[in-house]
Amino acid sequence: VGTHSVHLLADFDINAGAPGSGTTGLPQYAKFGRTIPTQMWDGFLSSNYHSLQVAVNRSFSKGLMLKGAYTYSKAIDYTDADGWASVGFNWGPSFERNRAAAGFDRTQVLQMGWVYELPMGKGKLIAKSGIAEKVLGNWQVNGIFAAYTGTPFTISGPTASLNAPGNSQTANQVKASVDKLGKYGPGQLYYDPTAFAAVTAAATFGNSGRNILRA
């Protein structure tokens, strides 16, 4: 299953500055002295979704019903609608840095549901009659199971060294790969934090991309 969406609405700051330009370098500063964001709401974005979907459907037979679905997919967009959609990189030459795995993307999703009729009661294997049949007969158990991969997130920077109002900054990835430590709980590390460092060079966005790690 695949979809391609076009003309998606979002905010675009037309008063965003170039790296290192600061407030006085904003496009609308020279003409109007305007130093605050100027949001343009327009249908200028697109997104893609591709997936492999498999379903299992076992009708009720011999006391068991089973339904399940598995999806392997990828969603790509420029921003996520989290109440008010806006892109992080508004300066024209940097715009394609917004394109990445969607913030809601889950690579794998597995869902299962089942109903099992216990083999007790009239016409069943045990407890076919009498008190046992009345107490234990005609019972069912059911369950739902779901497992899925985490959603992506960005390692952001403080933007001070970038000095480009209206734009985001990402951290520098200083190691070839980011080790997954896999620990959970307060104070525990899931990823190696030493794989990233703050951007110190002036007028630089950072070499890591949007949504490169997963929760």
Report the location of each language-model feature.
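Short, solvent-exposed micro-motifs at the edges of structured domains
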Residues: V1-A215
